[in-house]
Amino acid sequence: MNESYQPTLIEQLAQEYWEENETFEVKEDLSREKFYCLSMLPYPSGDLHMGHVRNYTIGDVIARYQIHKGRNVLQPMGWDAFGLPAENAAIQRELPPAEWTRKNIKKMRKQLKQLGFAYDWSREITTCDSTYYRWEQWLFLQLYKKGLAYKKNAIVNWDPVDQTVLANEQIVDGRGWRSGAVVERREISQWFLKITDYSEELLKDLDELKEWPEQVITMQRNWIGQSQGVIINFNFEKGPDKLQVYTTRPDTLMGVTYLAIAPEHPLAKERAKKSKKIAAFLKKCKQTRVAEADIATQEKEGIDSGLFAVHPLSKEKLPIWIANFVLMEYASGVVMAVPAHDERDHEFALKYDLPLKPVIEPADGHDWDYNQAAYTNPGKLINSGSFNDIDSKTAFNVIADYLKNNGAGSRQTHYRLRDWGISRQRYWGTPIPIIYCKTCGTVPVPENQLPVLLPEDIIPTGHGSPLKETASFYKTRCPVCNKPATRETDTMDTFVESSWYYARYSCPDQDKVMLDDRAKYWTPVDQYIGGIEHAVMHLLYARFMHKILRDLGLLNSNEPFIRLLTQGMVLKDGAKMSKSKGNVVTPQSLIKKYGADTVRLFIIFAAPPEQDLEWSDSGVEGAYRFLKKLWGFSYRIKDALLAINQQKERSNYQWEAPEHRQTRQQIHECLQQANIDMERLQFNTVVSAVMKILNILIKLTTDNDAEAHLIREGTGILLRLLSPITPHISHHLWQSLGFGGDILDTPWPRPDPKALQTTELELIVQINGKLRGRIQVPTEASKEIIESTALNQENVQRHLADKKIKKVIVVPKKLINIVV
């Protein structure tokens, strides 16, 4: 053991030891309790950033802690390798995305290994490998057979110059990020997965996720968006056709003054054929972004269709407008407009001089100026004929029943959740295993022809879809009739890859089936770690896919993740680290200067996992100083501990002196609190406990046999508490101080109940209720001894001078009050 702390050397030695001994490679073992710890897999950008380091350090602390607790721990790592960023980077660098991606993976794998994470690298997966996406294609075929994968027209952001679909984040001020062209809304045929078939179960099972953050549960509940409402039929003024409207406020039905339909509604398209003004309006609407948030905040615009519907109760004529704020994807693409009781309808009505008809007044009877603002709360019905004077809640049921009994409507449970559109008009993604034949139509690729390989030598230009221009890919033969046919050139949304990867880690070498029985052993994941930004999309899709895999008999649980931790961001100067802000701190430079253990210790000590972490250079220096202090202390006690650790009776040592028992009690109290905090995932206070223990031990001397044994016990506790957080130095010191074996094979320390037993009490001494001193007495001291000790306390005696004691009151285990 060197006298000075040399992190680079000891970290290299520890990592070589783990690799040579395959320390973290695990096998299924039914005799042991399993623990599956997983951090969200990274996109291989080429460089680890501090957000990665924090995420993976937290996960590693949890995994190593569970190893110490004797569990069979799986902690794998892989790469979310497909997607738009790789394609864009490849366009800029003029090289194939496959080449760029694999180069980045190699670099990032090395960076992760430098941090000493306890990953089972034998299970590594890369989502752009055909051995992985082959099973994703197989899964798509199963969904297609069950009617859960289907194709329909949907609206997308279309760049007319680059001839490609854009994600919302690729649009800057209404223009394509590369071409600068004005982006259009275009309707194209796309593949969808029927997640809505699982809406009710996805909502209901949120109640089972007891160890998920409440914020995530709420976000998913709102995204699924269950509502109870009524479908209402509005017949056309002329002809047998009707428009169906879904509403959660049937109590406002008598206040409807117009209907509004989406620009993509078939009726709007039909009217555009007969009116140039309507056609021009629909064209203008195509230049609106697709995102719901953008539509909600844009200026409300519309045009009269020239058609009328009939109110189902009053039989009044209602004009039908085409409005840019109505979403075709929501319900039926038709809105019943109640301007007096809906802010959006109110804004639109004032703009186009449409009538307002108040039908709800505040329940407390105070006046409301409906011309100034819509009254949107429940209340009492007015101007509603036979429904007058009943409250909104009662009116919901009364009007719903009336509509049902008169064939004008029906109750319906509605979900805001829409089917998952997985088509991407991109190159770098999983090919969708579908063939189009002029004779046979849409034909799924036979399972024995999987995988449909993505050509990896393409250099995308950013114009159009590269697969549509690659004849060697799209030209094929129909598997049914053997005539010339074409492949689907859309690729899958990368969220599909990340919706089932956690299960594939259980059997990445399996080439006969998607998942085998090992998946049932390891799933569900016991602890999942990742950012709150994935609360809805990724986590919802993974929950959906887990239920699909269960229904296919591949898994035997209902949910993928038992416990979820959403870690906070890493900030510098109050802002999230980013290259554009110039506030990035690179992990590699810190590891080179201080070592991985220092980086890990700072990350863990600086803030609780779920809170944002403010970067501090002085905090990193402080972590480094602590590890040097630990090393220096260990070097000083090395010879004494090596000698004690060779003694057979070392574990049965008895401490007699009160001061030694008190010191031991302090150490075990720190351990007791640290164990509570480890279970609560409050790792920063575990570090605080370790620092307290070291400060206690440093004051002891190895020249005293009792204290030397205290140092041995305390150091053994300290190193195990640090082992999940700073594994390299803990591994090295454990062996250098003669504790024997691998520290990871030793059980997690537990406080000794005897050590926690208090032998002395501190009591406060009052004179006429005022604090005058404190005394230490044995726990079982008699009243006489307590009184005598209190009266002989120096400060108490000074205040008693020339005073006559009337009585002494002893409150057991709390205080003594001397009345004078």
Curated annotation (Swiss-Prot):
One Gene Ontology term, aspect cellular component: cytosol
Xref: Gene3D superfamilies: 3.10.20.590, HUPs, Isoleucyl-tRNA Synthetase, Domain 1, Valyl/Leucyl/Isoleucyl-tRNA synthetase, editing domain
CDD domains noted in UniProt: Anticodon_Ia_Leu_BEm, LeuRS_core
Protein keywords: Aminoacyl-tRNA synthetase, ATP-binding, Cytoplasm, Ligase, Nucleotide-binding, Protein biosynthesis
One term of GO molecular function: leucine-tRNA ligase activity
Compartments it resides in: Cytoplasm
Residues that, per the record, bind ATP: 579
Chemical reaction(s) catalysed: tRNA(Leu) + L-leucine + ATP = L-leucyl-tRNA(Leu) + AMP + diphosphate
EC nos: 6.1.1.4
Family statement: Belongs to the class-I aminoacyl-tRNA synthetase family.
Protein name: Leucine--tRNA ligase
Record organism: Coxiella burnetii (strain RSA 331 / Henzerling II)
Lineage of origin: Bacteria, Pseudomonadati, Pseudomonadota, Gammaproteobacteria, Legionellales
Gene name per UniProt: leuS
